Amino acid sequence: MNAEPSIQSKLLDLAAVDAELTRIEHRRKVLPEEQEVQRLEAERTARKDASVKVEILIDDLDRDIRKLEGEIDAVRKREDRDRGMLTSGSVGAKQLSELQHELTSLERRRKVLEDDEIDVMERREAAAADHAHAGANLDQAEADLVDAERRRDDAVADLNVAQQRCDSDRSALSGGFPADLLAVYEKQRATGGIGAALLQARRCGACRIELDRGEISRIAKTAPDVVVRCPECNAILVRTKHSGL
């Protein structure tokens, strides 16, 4: 295949644009701002779970408090009933003794229930404080995530601008090559990653391998308009006065 040396040299410009496109694509895949968003999303989920866990605990404690209040109220009503019977003077000695014994038992039971209620209410108060703390943590995580998403979107927008510029440059450059030369370049780029590279100081700019004397001698004898390729990676080699020929 033949192409004017000036045309071959422009392949380096195309390769430079393609290298930048490759870097842009790689940066998209490993974008630090995206990784930070993902980390903060996980953090927000964890803090949301922690907040929900405390909410469930508070609901359970509220249910326990209502149950204890109901039991305490029932005991007090029985106490009031028994005291009413005691003060009525209408009960006999045996029933009087039974009522007094029952009142003692009811009072003991009420105190146990009231102590339990105090314990649950204290736990409920602590849980409410935990919930407020968890809510503050969640609010902070959501604010951090919003900020990280903004930075990520800005970074992606910058990459989009850079890619659009490279796409435009590539389109302009591609139109200046013979179809057969461009086809060889594109095929090599698709398989080897780098379509064309500078031969400099006897070293291929694509695979970075130094060519042996025999290969260098062969290339040196090849007409300037003949397209030569690296024997190692098959990239198109662009020759200049710095090629070491």
PLM ranges: what are they?
Residues 145-206:
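Coiled-coil termination/hinge junctions
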Residues 209, 232-235:
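Short Cys/His-rich local motifs and their 1-3 flanking residues in nucleic-acid-associated proteins
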Residues 53-65, 106-127, 173-174:
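Amphipathic alpha-helical coiled-coil segments
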Residues 1-5, 19-59, 85, 132-148:
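Short, charge-rich amphipathic alpha-helices with coiled-coil/heptad character
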Residues 67-79, 113-138, 184:
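Long amphipathic alpha-helical coiled-coil segments
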Residues 219-227:
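Short linker/helix segments within small regulatory modules
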Residues 204, 230-233:
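Short cysteine-rich clusters marking metal-coordination/redox-active sites
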Residues 213-214, 239-240:
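Short, non-ligating residues that shape and space the ligands of small metal-coordination modules
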